[in-house]
A protein has these predicted regions:
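Small side chains
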Residues: 8-11, 149
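Bacterial N-terminal signal peptides that target proteins for export
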Residues: 1-8
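Hydrophobic h-region of N-terminal signal peptides that target proteins for export
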Residues: 10-20
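Acidic, metal/ion-coordinating pockets
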Residues: 19-161
Length: 161
């Protein structure tokens, strides 16, 4: 009887230890308003790489205005594409739209979204006349059982004047 009780207590203790919450650190890295500053990408890549070397759980996101504002990127065969290629290479997880993502029109924006290897979310661009695919309003990124929700929202910008 004592052996059964002891075995039962050991089993309960083992189960409790397995179910105990464990402390984990998740690092959230965010960029925004990069405005095609391609010359700064090596520093960004080094910082992200160093973070990934020391932290196991890293999520990389962007809040928009990424591909216009630099002559080299603006005049590329596909304007903006150098930034998207670098962001794909760096392994972004999620992005939303900024007002400057619309600078070249909706068809261009749709092509750029198709070129991204990461999720693009935006909750407040809803229109029957959009020429790019309807974007999901949010996404959930899972890192080792930690679930983080991201909702994309773009500023309501109608332009000057």
């Amino acid at each position: 009887m004592k052996g059964m009780l002891r075995m039962g207590l050991v089993a309960v203790a083992a189960l409790a230890a397995a179910c105990a919450p464990r402390e984990r650190t998740l690092v959230l890295l965010s960029t925004n308003d990069m405005h095609a500053k391609i010359q700064r990408f090596p520093q960004l890549a080094a910082a992200v790489g160093a973070c990934r070397d020391t932290a196991r759980l890293v999520v990389l996101v962007d809040a928009g205005d990424r591909w216009t504002g630099n002559a080299y990127v603006d005049m590329a065969p596909t304007p903006g594409m150098p930034m998207i290629a670098l962001m794909n290479e760096l392994g972004y997880d999620v992005a939303t739209l900024g007002n400057h993502e619309f600078d070249h029109g909706q068809a261009f924006l749709g092509r750029m979204i198709d070129s991204m290897d990461f999720e693009v979310v935006c909750a407040n661009v809803v229109s029957d006349t959009c020429t790019f695919p309807q974007l999901p309003p949010y996404t959930i990124v899972d890192r080792d059982g930690i679930r983080i929700g991201f909702v994309g929202v773009v500023t309501n910008y109608e332009g000057p004047g």
